[in-house]
Amino acid sequence: SFNTAEHLLALQQPNSIKKIIVEVPKSAKFNRNFVKIMVSNSKNIPPSLKKKFKANIVVVYEFGACEYSANVKQTGDYKDHIAMDVGGKPLRSLKIKLKNGNVLNAIKFKLLLPETRNNLNEVLGSVVMRELGFISPETFQVKVDVNGTESIMLFQEDARKELLERNLRREGPM
């Protein structure tokens, strides 16, 4: 809903993102999957319940919004990646793969429940590592709305080619 050429610098800054909205059209199946994870006997999230769902992602900036098609799925090994908010609505850590476009040059990223990464300690750790010259994924706190359930989550880009490019490195053999 805006001319990207006018906002190129702002599109590269995490603080220009006001909110990320995740809409899963098949929300009944998405919620049923959440319940199956909750009631499973294991402390771990069974891999069979980490199903992909088609979703629409809207990234709201100070100056407009961008819409993307995506696949989302449950991420995390342990059940600390799922929770209920005060009103009893489901919260979960998500892995998102955009089918078109990117957010801060990331095509794949995670929206994590803050408790799974010791809240802001993960953000502090990534900033310190970056300042020391290490390659570190873009990590920051952001408002998120998943099917109408609002929460604060951690955005963390996946360790992929875009991470290397952002750190002025090239892909190659190690």
Residue ranges and their predicted role:
Residues 1-174:
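Phosphate/dinucleotide-binding and metal-coordinating scaffold of catalytic cores
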